[in-house]
């Protein structure tokens, strides 16, 4: 298949619906609610123990999707939602030759409004050609109590962060205000509510956090297993799938010292509190619509932007992060990320299902009669929402405007309302050297530019049985389609390179974020079978400078003992690695079998190419 054929296969959905002269007799209101870094299993309706009665109500009175996919990253999903195509296809978020969804809905007579986190590329949400009303912030994260410098009400910078302010409440308040204005003016509305919850910083009221303290002392494995069992009871997952086990990046609960378990319980309690308070805000949105008599004829779509985030944090600072105080940055760890994404593999930033699987709840009483509480197994994706909303609202895509790129999604409105089968187009996934191509029921996926894997998503959506060796031709065909489409949309640089044969362990992406000149480590990061007698080695793309590093240590710890390093080193300019590209220590003590270790490096312990401090 040549490049143009590949692109045409992805664009088929837009040809299908745009050619039909659909005209709605009425224009229902639309609310899209986007959570930030919410895992697949966090909501009660998806197996979670967090108290989310309002979202559970929407699911129980509407339709929940079990095979909805987003993209691996906040910003790439947000662009895909607004553009109706992948982030790279939309000019890496530039929207070149792209007509954003709100702008098109405006042309169709809708009042378009947004409250929350933008982080969706180069288009400015303050532009009245995008949103008639806007309140929120532009970047990727914010302090939920005192904000940041990128908060705006329309074009006016917002600085009114008074004591008691919190982002979730503010976004809910603004959404209610904006919807009230539209109802008063008797115009249909598109309301985009993009909560920053539960992205870090995990900030919530003390009384909400306290409600969850102690609930997570059973540990990662027990909480995840309980979620998985509830998912089976709900019918969300296939019992034939093997739940993905955790890797070395997840510290084993039974090895953690008691003090660390208490900290980990508190970290997840903070996360649960943030989700809980978001659900409370959504409850207020529902109550407003009910009181206004608009709930039955309003389509509400709730979704997350990617799978659960991973962040082991720092043993030096985690206990000091107070969720109910400003200027703190509480996070949740890799272990809780594994829990959030149950039963799937990996986390945010990958192209495996742990990053892509997300909740999608559709609530529309007047349009979903007979579907109350149903689970829809259609493999819909975030790029399908744009064409679905066009068909719902009767707004036509300007198919004769040849300057515009075609949408790559396909409307699932008929499947939603009539329960007809959904014919999914091929899916192109990407983020920072990780990539995937999904076609029919098969998925080729690569992590960090490593070898392609192949999975049957019907039999093995948890990605535990790699078929690449057994089916090399199919693996090669799907990989070639990914490469051809990447070329068609003009991807360049390392993100579009042909994959290699070396597989970096989980977390390599984050290591390179903090040390971009890092080439490799020995033992490899997240290594399952490190040799018992070993050395510690870090290789860089430029020379290492150890001058001025005295008193800055590298330390090796057992997971079970955070107080006493099993090895530490304070290298200086006399070390043999000075001026070389490899920092090597051959005095590491013998490692114990079946034991987890990690390395901590003091800031400024060495520099790379003089200017790059690590």
Where are these regions (language model features)?
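Compositionally biased, intrinsically disordered low-complexity regions
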Residues: 12-14, 311, 550, 607
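N-terminal secretory signal peptides that target proteins for export/translocation
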Residues: 1-5
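Surface-exposed loop and edge beta-strand positions of immunoglobulin-like domains
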Residues: 71, 455, 586-589
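Acidic, low-complexity Ser/Thr/Gly/Pro-rich repeat segments typical of extracellular/periplasmic
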Residues: 514-614
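Formylglycine-dependent sulfatase
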Residues: 12, 23-448, 452, 459-480, ...
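Short polybasic amphipathic segments
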Residues: 148-154, 454, 553-556, 604
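Bacterial N-terminal signal peptides
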Residues: 8-20
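Glycine/proline-rich low-complexity spacer/linker segments in large multi-domain proteins
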Residues: 497-502
């Amino acid at each position: 298949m040549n490049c143009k054929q590949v692109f045409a296969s992805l664009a088929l959905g837009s040809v299908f619906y745009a050619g039909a002269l659909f005209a709605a007799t009425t224009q229902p209101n639309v609310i899209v609610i986007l959570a930030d870094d919410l895992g697949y299993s966090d909501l009660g309706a998806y197996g979670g123990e967090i108290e989310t009665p309002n979202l559970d109500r929407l699911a129980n009175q509407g339709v929940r999707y079990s095979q909805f996919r987003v993209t691996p990253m906040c910003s790439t999903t947000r662009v895909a939602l607004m553009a109706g195509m992948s982030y790279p296809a939309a000019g890496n978020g530039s929207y070149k030759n792209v007509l954003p969804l709100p702008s098109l809905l405006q042309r169709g007579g809708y009042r378009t409004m947004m409250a929350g986190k933008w982080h969706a590329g180069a288009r400015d949400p303050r532009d009245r050609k995008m949103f008639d009303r806007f309140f929120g912030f532009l970047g990727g994260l914010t302090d939920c109590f005192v904000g940041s410098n990128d908060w705006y009400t329309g074009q006016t910078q917002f600085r009114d962060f008074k004591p008691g302010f919190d982002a979730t409440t503010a976004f809910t308040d603004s959404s209610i205000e904006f919807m009230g204005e539209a109802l008063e003016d008797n115009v249909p509305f598109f309301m985009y509510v993009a909560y920053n919850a539960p992205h870090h910083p995990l900030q919530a009221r003390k009384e909400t956090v306290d409600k969850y303290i102690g609930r997570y002392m059973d540990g990662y494995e027990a909480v995840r297993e309980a979620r998985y069992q509830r998912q089976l009871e709900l019918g969300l997952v296939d019992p034939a799938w093997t739940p993905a086990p955790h890797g070395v990046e997840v510290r084993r609960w039974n090895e953690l010292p008691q003090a660390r378990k208490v900290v980990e319980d508190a970290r997840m309690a903070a996360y649960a509190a943030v989700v809980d308070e978001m659900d409370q805000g959504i409850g207020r949105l529902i109550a407003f619509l009910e009181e206004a008599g608009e709930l039955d004829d309003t389509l509400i779509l709730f979704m997350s932007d990617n799978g659960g985030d991973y962040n082991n944090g720092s043993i030096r600072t985690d206990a000091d992060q107070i969720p109910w105080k400003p200027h703190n940055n509480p996070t949740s760890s890799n272990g809780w990320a594994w829990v959030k994404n149950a039963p799937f593999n990996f986390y945010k930033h990958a192209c495996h299902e742990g990053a892509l699987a997300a909740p999608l709840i559709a609530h529309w009483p007047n349009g979903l009669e007979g579907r109350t509480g149903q689970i829809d197994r259609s493999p819909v994706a975030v790029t399908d929402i744009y064409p679905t909303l066009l068909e719902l609202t009767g707004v036509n895509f300007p198919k004769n405007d040849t300057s515009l790129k075609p949408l790559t999604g396909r409307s699932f409105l008929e499947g939603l309302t009539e329960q007809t089968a959904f014919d999914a187009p091929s899916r192109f996934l990407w983020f920072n050297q990780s990539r995937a191509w999904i076609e029919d029921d098969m998925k080729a996926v690569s992590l960090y530019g490593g070898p392609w894997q192949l999975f049957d998503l019907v039999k093995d959506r948890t990605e535990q049985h790699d078929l690449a060796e057994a089916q090399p031709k199919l693996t090669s065909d799907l990989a070639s389609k990914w490469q051809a489409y990447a070329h068609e949309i003009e991807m360049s640089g390392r993100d579009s390179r042909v994959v290699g044969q070396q597989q970096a362990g989980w977390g390599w992406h984050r290591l390179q974020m903090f040390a971009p000149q890092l080439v490799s480590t020995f033992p490899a990061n997240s290594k399952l079978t490190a040799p018992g007698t070993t050395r510690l080695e870090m290789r860089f793309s430029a020379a290492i400078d150890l001058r001025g590093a005295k008193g800055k240590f590298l330390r090796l710890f057992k997971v079970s003992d955070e107080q006493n390093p099993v090895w530490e080193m304070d290298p200086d300019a006399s070390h043999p690695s000075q001026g070389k590209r490899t920092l090597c220590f051959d005095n590491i003590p013998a490692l114990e079998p079946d034991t987890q270790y990690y390395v901590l490096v003091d800031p400024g312990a060495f520099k790379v190419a003089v200017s790059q401090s690590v």
